[in-house]
């Protein structure tokens, strides 16, 4: 069983310099954007087209948007806008991933050298951490996860 190195990162509460330096230092080869909407204005450098350009230019890093790994609008809205409970959000998102059968629809090799991107600065209350934990459980602990 081959181990797969994967990172996660959030782009808020950081500068563009710090964001890109962390990716480069970690040796990230591909950023997988797991946001529901990848046109966020929360940070100027994180808008989809701009981000893809900067990643390629700064570090030769590929970019892809993977909405399969994003929560639905309803799940996200209940937590963010309506100040919902994290445990409810977590339970609903884990159920959504199971319903979507993400462990069968994604190949582990897709995540090798990749970094899951979302807006949250820390992974504690972010779905990118839940994605890694869910897949690690389904893929027999193959993922070696580092939160940048």
Q: Residues of each region from the PLM?
A:
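Residues lining hydrophobic/aromatic ligand-binding pockets adjacent to catalytic sites
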Residues: 1-148
């Amino acid at each position: 069983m081959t181990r797969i190195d994967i990172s996660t990162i959030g782009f808020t509460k950081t500068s563009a310099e710090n964001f890109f330096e962390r990716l480069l230092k970690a040796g990230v080869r591909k950023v997988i954007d797991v946001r529901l909407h990848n046109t966020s204005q929360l940070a100027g450098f994180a808008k989809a087209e701009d981000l893809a350009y900067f990643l390629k230019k700064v570090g030769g890093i590929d970019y892809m948007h993977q909405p399969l790994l994003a929560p639905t609008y309803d799940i996200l809205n209940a937590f963010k806008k309506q100040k919902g409970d994290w445990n409810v959000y977590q339970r609903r998102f884990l159920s959504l991933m199971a319903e979507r059968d993400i462990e069968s629809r994604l190949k582990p090799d897709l995540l090798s050298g990749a970094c899951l991107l979302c807006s949250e600065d820390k992974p504690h209350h972010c779905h990118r951490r839940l994605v890694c934990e869910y897949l690690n459980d389904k893929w027999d602990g193959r993922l070696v996860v580092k939160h940048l």
